[in-house]
């Protein structure tokens, strides 16, 4: 069985997220996809948007297929959300499964700074998506470094959609062509 973890703050989710998840699903062909909004990420401040609302917004990802589930595990967990803890939980929940985890290219380049990163590499295959056009050389160098440390890395080709949740929240840029079409009733 293949399980794909797609984590993020998702505050709010947007078409760029949908695009990246679609590409990762095409590359991996997973049996189950776990969309997991972060509780309190270690590299960011806690989201001002309540976890319950972000979970509800993430229901839109289910449009990509019946294998997509939204997990509240990190939102419900006390304290900071470390990827190591999440992946360890998934190993227990899906014993024997091949675990895949999507990350953006910016995260690949700093992955060796993550909490217990070597152990994460031993548990998952990283599915990397580029966020910037033309960052191929830097990505290949970062991937090679992690592969030398025992990591398994694959790239999911997706058109780059320049869109950021922070800009949507701030209202500084109009992303109406990249926001999701479904309105959420809460």
Regions flagged by a language model, labelled:
Residues 39-123:
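N-terminal Rossmann-like or analogous alpha/beta NTP/dinucleotide-binding catalytic cores
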Residues 65-68, 148-153:
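A short helix-to-beta-strand connector/capping loop
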């Amino acid at each position: 069985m293949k399980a794909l973890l797609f984590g993020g703050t998702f505050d709010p989710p947007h078409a760029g997220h949908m695009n990246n998840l679609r590409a990762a699903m095409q590359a991996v062909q997973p049996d189950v996809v776990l969309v997991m909004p972060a509780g309190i990420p270690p590299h960011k401040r806690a989201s001002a948007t309540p976890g319950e609302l972000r979970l509800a917004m993430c229901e839109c990802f289910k449009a990509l297929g019946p294998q997509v589930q939204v997990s509240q595990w990190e939102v419900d967990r006390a304290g900071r959300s470390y990827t190591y803890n999440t992946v360890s939980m998934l190993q227990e929940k899906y014993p024997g499964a091949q675990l895949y985890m999507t990350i953006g290219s910016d995260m690949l380049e700093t992955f060796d700074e993550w909490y217990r990163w070597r152990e994460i590499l031993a548990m998952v295959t990283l599915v990397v998506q580029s966020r910037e056009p033309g960052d191929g050389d830097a990505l290949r160098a970062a991937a090679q470094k992690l592969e030398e440390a025992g990591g398994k890395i694959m790239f999911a080709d997706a058109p780059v959609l320049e869109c950021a949740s922070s800009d949507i929240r701030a209202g500084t840029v109009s992303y109406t062509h990249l926001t999701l079409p479904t309105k959420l009733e809460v």
